[in-house]
Amino acid sequence: MQKFILSAFVVALVAADCALKCPDGYFSFKRAPSAKNSMTGLWCVKAILSDTLISPNQAKQVCEKDGSILTSFENLDERTKLATVLRDFLSAKKLDRGGMIVDGHRLKNCETDDRTVLNAEPCRNSSTGFTTDEKHTDNTFMWKSWADTEPGQSIFEKQIESCLQLAISQFKSRTELINDVFCNYVKHPQNEGAYDLWNYGAVCGRLPEWN
């Protein structure tokens, strides 16, 4: 009996020592594994922010430099925690608005300036006209997290707003929510003073590692 108890104790110690763990600086988001998130039970997420504004197209590089990939949130708790990090960052800079890039973009056939296509299914539907690349996050909740009046479908020089940001806004109906933005521009090409469309970084994710 004593040998059994000792063996069980050793097994418990080994299991605890070999637990999956997220790197320092990353949130450890526990998720319900499902086919929609590739059976991911733990996903490590970090908002990587800096004083240098980025275009959405630069976001993947920001994550890659940290050994991660561009990601997003799966539920309200995750969204709130990420938004809080962004809000605190902006407050430290004495700013009351701004954003960071999250995974997500329009479907390829919806990246058009043809209003006939944009106003038809699936493009006109905010939950079917967009998709995500990262497969460890169920994006169902994200498509319910649009800021008021979004997605906006603004077009500039035949380019449509296709990438996504999570933003802090001075308006309650738009803060801590997602918005479609131009992928190629650091600032809005038609309104460079729209500070809520400035992006200071990206939301990055990675799988945990055995400790």
Swiss-Prot record:
Coiled coil: none annotated. The keyword Transferase does not apply. Residues 1-16 form the signal peptide. It comes from Caenorhabditis elegans. Disulfide bonds: none annotated. Transmembrane segments: none annotated. Keywords: Signal. The lineage of its organism: Eukaryota, Metazoa, Ecdysozoa, Nematoda, Chromadorea. InterPro entries: C-type_lectin-like/link_sf, CTDL_fold. This is C-type lectin domain-containing protein 158. SUPFAM superfamilies: C-type lectin-like (SSF56436).
